Amino acid sequence: MPDVARRDLNLLPKAHLHLHFTGSLDIPTLRELSAWEGLDEAEQLIDDDPLSVPATKRGWWRFQRTYDIARHVVISERALRAVVDAAARNDAAQGSRRTEIQVDPTSYAPYVNGLVNALEIILDEAALASRRHGIQMGVIVAASRLHHPLDARTLARLSARFAGRGPGGVIGFGLSNDETEGNTVEFGPAFRIARRAGIPGVPHGGEFRGPHHIAQVIDELHPTRIGHGIHAAESPALLKRIVDAGITLEVNPASNVSLGVYPDYSKVPLRTLLDAGAQVALGSDDPLLFLSGLTDQYRIARDYLGLSDAELAELARMSIRGSFAEQADKARWLAEVDAWLAAAPESGPGLPAAGVVPVPGGLVARPSGLLVPERGLVAPPGNGGAESADAGQAVPDARNVTPGL
C-alpha cells in the first residue's frame, strides 16, 4: 500500500450503535471471567478451532456453539459488570463518544435471581462505566425471534420501567436472532408498548433476508433504526422509503463478510446506501467473534471501499445523529468530528483493515487496539471458493448469529 496522508481513525469521534452484549467481550476479559468462575470455556474458545477458521466455513450451529461458550462464562453479577465495563473501555479507546449496547437480560436472569435484577445490574454498571471511561453508554433491550412474542411484551414492559436517554437508561427496544424464525407481525404489540413509553424501536432486519423482509419490519415494527438492513441496497424503491422516513441503517461490514453475506469487503454495498442518501452508522456487531472492533469498520470503508477522510467523517456524524443521545451532546461531538477533519493528516502507510501487530503474551493487537489470540486471527475472506456466497446471498447454514445478545 502506498504512503498516504491519513488521519487516525481511533481519534475520530463516533457513536457505536450496533453491539451485542456477550459478543462485545475481548479475549483478556473472557479469560479473566473464566478464571473467576473456575471454568475452561475461554480456552475452548481461544485454543480450539472455532475462532481459527472463517465463520463461513463453520456453519450456523458451530457458530452458535462458539457464542454459547462465551456466554457460559457470564454467570454472575461480577461477570455482567465486567462485560459492560470492558465494552465501555474498548469503545472509548476507539473514539466512541456514545455506545448503545443491546442485551436480552433473559439469558442472564437465572444467575442473578431474576430478570429485573439482571437488567438493573447492567444499567447500573453502564452508568458507572460511562463515568469511569468518559463515554456515554445506553442500553437497548432486545427480544429474541426464537422466543414467544409474549416474552417480547414482558421485556417491553420491563424496558418502560427503566426508560431514559442518559447513561444507564434503556434507550431502545430491539428484536434480533435468526431472521428466518418468528413472525414479525406477532412482535408488533411489544414494539407498541415500547413506543408508548417513549422508547424507539431498533429491530434487526435485512441481514440475511431481502428487501421484502425489511419492508415488513418497517410496516409492522415502525423502527427508528434498523440493525443491518444491508439488503435494502437491492431495492431503489425501498431505499427511497428508508431515506424519506429518516431511518438509520446499522451496517456491520466485518460481520457481513465473516458470515458469508458478501464474499469480500469490496462487495459490501455501503456506497450504494450512501449514494442514495441513507443514514448509515457503522458497527462491529460481535467483536469477540469477528475479531473486528469499531475502528476496524471505518478502516474497511477506507481501505476496501475507498472512502475519503471527509466521507468517513460524515459516517461518524451519521452515527452520532442516529444515536439517542441528547441534542446538546450530539452538537458537541459533531463539532469534535469537524475538528478531527480540520486537523492535518498524518503521513505514512495506512494500516489495512486486517493489519495486526504482535504483542507479548501470545496476543496480537489489531489496529483498533482490540487484543485477540494469535491463532484466532481470521483474515478477510475474499478469495472465493466453495464456502463463499455470491453477493447478496447467505451461505446455506449461515444465519443471524447473535443469539446471546
Give residue spans per PLM region.
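Intrinsically disordered, low-complexity Ser/Thr/Pro-rich tracts
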Residues: 382-385, 399
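Metal-cofactor-binding active-site regions of metalloenzymes
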Residues: 1-199, 208-213, 220-225, 231-377, ...
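Short linear motifs in low-complexity or flexible loops
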Residues: 379, 386-389
